[in-house]
Regions:
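Extended, non-catalytic structural segments that build the interaction scaffolds
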Residues: 35, 323-349
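A generic structural motif
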Residues: 134-136, 277, 319
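A short, flexible helix-boundary coil/loop motif
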Residues: 1-27, 39, 150, 157, ...
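Conserved, well-structured functional cores that handle cations and Mg-NTP chemistry
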Residues: 2-198, 202-222, 226-229, 236, ...
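Catalytic-loop motifs flanking and including active-site residues across diverse enzymes
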Residues: 129, 351, 355, 377, ...
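Generic structural signal for hydrophobic core residues of well-folded globular domains
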Residues: 39, 43, 55, 67-70, ...
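Non-catalytic, well-ordered alpha-helical scaffold segments
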Residues: 30-34, 49, 327, 340-343, ...
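Short amphipathic alpha-helical "interface-anchor" segments enriched in bulky aromatics
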Residues: 98, 102, 203, 251-262, ...
């Protein structure tokens, strides 16, 4: 046990070196490995005091100062996380998933806390909400960013923002889609590679968000509410027939927009399986048609009042689940893409929910007990670094198992007698567990090597 634990500590120390090198001061360089290992290690609570107690090093004051009170810039470490995440799972076949996660809280003093919808509880609750970016390839997610959303009750109260230490650049009211676009820009600037941006209807409803992704030349597939308006793909702009009143000066569409669910009412639906789950293949019925989204400039159309003109062409996709639930999506993916591929891309978004759950249940994302902006974001950053390390170990183990399987298959093939040829089917690594299990008993904690 001791040997294995020391090996793990050594591996963590080596893996953390690029992050530690960006921290500057010697004390911060020593506290970072301690904090990360405290998050990964055993214990029900991953806040500063219980972690310091488990370290048995009397490090509470220094750990607390490192996370909550120290004066240091987190952005270089955040950039390093983007670089390391791209090395782990980046590529054109990766997806970037936009979502948010709620951290239930008591009281009113923790930064950003307010009565708002908490997805983890399925209702409105007193909580903090953090916009998240998750990079995923296959079934391996790595969290890239967690940025706090500030409700109006906070952005309208400068004294409250000052007490929580909110930086000046973040005191202006920003919607969740606006925060997401800013974090996407940060990821792109760091060279993170991905093929498609995915988001749920909370973001897909926002025309500026969709248009912002398109302006950045990004492929996207987002959830939308069933009532979002669209036009047929072949809608034409015509000169309106003159009637009473002043003559019209602008073209109008030759057909009115309609709700997404109505556009798919007579579509052809197909049963599609997109991946295997613990209880077998995951299936649903899908349909897709090309449309033009009603997110152009608003204009009065005949006697129907103001309507948005046709915007860019996109896929409108519907999903009928076995439970009876219906979901709708928009995607600016290529017009020649087949329905099965569209469905597979859309359903890849589920991986971020697994990442949120693991960050909370195994690494204590929602255990931070401080009230400040910097403290919350530094704690969140350390949990993301810990998560990235565990995914690094997960991928390393999978590659080793795959190599061993191939070696065994080659040996078996070599032992076969001539005259009995058999087709050789390539093997793959066994399904990987969500996160690698670490030793529950720890001989010692990582020490500073830098």
């Amino acid at each position: 046990m001791v040997g294995r634990t020391l090996d793990w500590n050594d591996e963590l120390g080596r893996w953390l070196k690029p992050f530690v090198d960006r921290l500057g001061h010697r004390a911060r360089r020593r506290m970072c490995p301690l904090y990360v290992s405290g998050l990964i290690g055993p214990g029900d609570r991953k806040s500063v005091q219980p972690m310091a107690k488990r370290l048995v090093l009397g490090e509470y004051d220094q750990l607390h100062h490192f996370i909550a009170a120290g004066v240091w810039e987190a952005s270089p470490v955040e950039t390093e996380l983007l670089v390391q995440a791209d090395r782990l799972v980046g590529g054109r076949d990766a997806v970037l998933v936009i979502d948010d996660t709620a951290l239930p809280k008591k009281g009113t003093h923790s930064v950003g806390v307010a009565a708002q919808y908490a997805s983890v509880l399925g209702k409105t609750a007193n909580c903090q909400t953090m916009v998240s970016l998750t990079l995923a390839r296959g079934e391996v997610p790595v969290m890239l960013a967690l940025r706090l959303f500030l409700p109006e009750s906070w952005t309208s109260n400068q004294a409250r923002l000052e007490r929580a230490g909110v930086p000046a650049d973040y005191r202006t009211a920003r919607s969740k889609p606006e925060i997401a676009l800013a974090e996407i820009d940060r990821a792109i600037a760091a060279g993170v590679r991905f093929g498609c941006v995915l988001a749920d209807a909370g973001y897909g409803l926002s025309a500026p968000f969709r248009q912002g992704l398109t302006a950045r030349k990004l492929a996207w597939a987002v959830g939308i509410p069933r009532h979002l308006k669209v036009y047929p793909a072949d809608v034409r702009m015509i000169w309106p027939i003159a009637g009473r009143g002043r003559p019209r000066k602008r073209y109008i569409p030759d057909i009115l927009s309609m709700a997404a669910e109505d556009m798919l009412a007579n579509a052809r639906w197909r049963a599609i399986s997109w991946r295997s789950g613990t209880k077998g293949k995951l299936k649903a019925r899908f349909a897709a048609v090309r449309v033009r989204v009603a997110d152009g400039p608003p204009q009065r159309i005949r006697d129907k009042g103001q309507q948005h003109l046709p915007g860019d062409q996109a896929w409108l996709i519907g999903e009928h689940r076995i439970s009876g639930e219906k979901k709708y999506y928009l995607a600016n993916l290529p017009a020649k893409m087949d329905l099965r591929t569209l469905a597979s891309i859309i359903k890849a978004r589920w991986i971020c929910e697994q990442a949120h759950q693991q960050l909370k249940e195994e690494l204590g994302l929602d255990h931070f007990e401080g009230r400040s902006w910097h403290g919350l974001h530094r704690h969140a950053l350390m949990t993301m670094i810990a998560y990235a390390f565990l995914q690094y170990r997960r991928l390393k183990t999978a590659r080793r198992e795959k190599k061993n399987q191939r070696a065994a298959a080659s040996a078996n093939l070599a032992r076969r007698a001539p005259g009995h040829p058999r087709s050789h089917r390539s093997t793959t690594a066994a399904a990987m567990s969500p996160l690698p299990k670490m030793d529950s008993q720890r001989a010692e904690w990582p020490t500073n090597r830098y």
